[in-house]
Design a protein with these regions (language model features):
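An alpha-helical repeat/solenoid feature that recognizes helix-turn-helix modules
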Residues: 3-37, 47-95, 106-147, 163, ...
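Alpha-helical scaffold repeats of the Armadillo/HEAT/TPR superfamily
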Residues: 35-40, 89-97, 148-154, 200-215
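Short glycine/proline-rich, acidic loop/turn segments that cap or connect secondary-structure elements
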Residues: 150-164
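Terminal, non-catalytic domain-edge segments
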Residues: 157, 169-225, 229, 234
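C-terminal single-pass membrane-anchor helix
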Residues: 237-238
Length: 238
């Protein structure tokens, strides 16, 4: 996790998901590695664009990447009355990103990403990433006015991509898609957890791990093969 050159091989995704992985449980870092967490946070902040967003590559903000970046920074965002536990102040960056996401939302409540021609196309995955990010920050994507356009929330937009019988589409005119289904359902799980006062999607500190003792293997190597020493009685007549 401390090798930023290695993490950077995946592009902007690397530090973002490394930070999410590090923070998903109560993991203790060695005393000489406490700098890693703040280094990852700072790395994510350093990738932020001037308009408040994050890009897959280049200098044009993308809703998916901005949503993912916010998911990684949510733990460090200070709500009113909270005390800072870490040295890095992420609030200005998060607030700027939220302002941008409000502006990026389409009139039907959806979000999009770039297609092969450089056009921004609404996709269910883009909506899913924004919904997951808002839930991680304690923001209700169904009721917060910043993320409602023409009476349509991000949740409304996501459900437009739902396929009857189970699953989600990538694009509105497509069939059921694996990645769209995965992200659509975990976005709804994130929203469910928010509504029920549970930890955010990637905060698994509420999971109790119980060790399971493996059964002792049965050693039958010393057993003799009785059949090998058994004489067979000839019962044939004649």
């Amino acid at each position: 996790l401390g090798d930023m050159n290695f993490l950077g091989m995946q592009g902007n995704n690397g530090p973002i998901w490394a930070l999410i992985a590090l923070d998903c449980g109560d993991y203790e870092l060695p005393d000489d590695a406490n700098y890693i967490r703040e280094m990852l946070v700072q790395s994510v902040l350093n990738m932020q664009l001037e308009d408040g967003g994050w890009a897959i590559a280049g200098d044009t903000a993308d809703a998916d990447m901005t949503g993912m970046a916010l998911q990684s920074l949510a733990k460090y965002y200070l709500h009113e009355g909270e005390t800072a536990a870490y040295a890095v102040d992420v609030n200005p960056a998060v607030d700027a990103a939220l302002d941008l996401l409000s502006q990026m939302q389409f009139d039907d409540g959806s979000y999009g990403t770039f297609d092969g021609s450089g056009n921004i196309v609404p996709t269910s995955e883009s909506i899913s990433q924004v919904v997951t990010a808002l839930c991680a920050l304690g923001i209700d994507p169904e009721t917060d006015e910043r993320f409602i356009k023409n009476g349509c929330s991000a949740i409304d937009a996501l459900m437009d991509y739902y396929v009857e019988g189970g699953g989600f589409r990538h694009l509105l005119d497509h069939d059921r898609d694996g990645m769209a289904t995965e992200q659509g359902f975990y976005a709804l799980v994130a929203y469910y957890r928010l509504l029920n006062g549970q930890t955010s999607l990637y905060d698994m500190t509420d999971v109790k791990l119980e060790g399971v003792k493996a059964e002792e293997p049965v050693d039958d190597t010393d057993k003799s093969d009785d059949t090998a020493d058994t004489e067979v009685e000839d019962t044939s007549s004649g």
